[in-house]
Amino acid sequence: MKESETGRIEVSPGAIASLVSQVVLECYGVVDMASKDLATDLIERLPFDNRRRGVDVHIGDDQIVIDLYVVIEYGTRIITVAQNIQSTAKYYVEKALGVPVAAVNIHVQDLRISAD
C-alpha cells in the first residue's frame, strides 16, 4: 500500500473495515450495520469478532473502494444520512492511511426505529 525507506507498509482490508465500521456507527441516523445477503448474515451471526459486519473493502492500485451495508433510523432523511456516511468514511480512511478512497457505496438494507 505504501513504500517507505525501510520497506513496504500493508494494511489489511479487515483492518480498514474495522475502522470504517466504528466510524459509520457513530454517524447520525445510523442504527446498525447490516449484512449484504442472507448467507453472509448467517455467517456473521457465528460467535466471532463482528466489527467488520456490513463493510466490504476493495484495495486496488493506490485506491480503495468501500461498500457499506447499513440500517438507517426511520424518519431520517435517507439521502442526507447516506451522504454524511460517505464523506465521514472517506475522510477517516484517507486521514488514517494517506491513500485516496475512490468510492464509498452505501447500501441501505433496512430502516428501523432506534432504541433511544
Model-predicted segments: where are they?
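Contiguous, often N-terminal, cationic amphipathic patches that form binding interfaces
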Residues: 1-78, 83, 95, 99-116
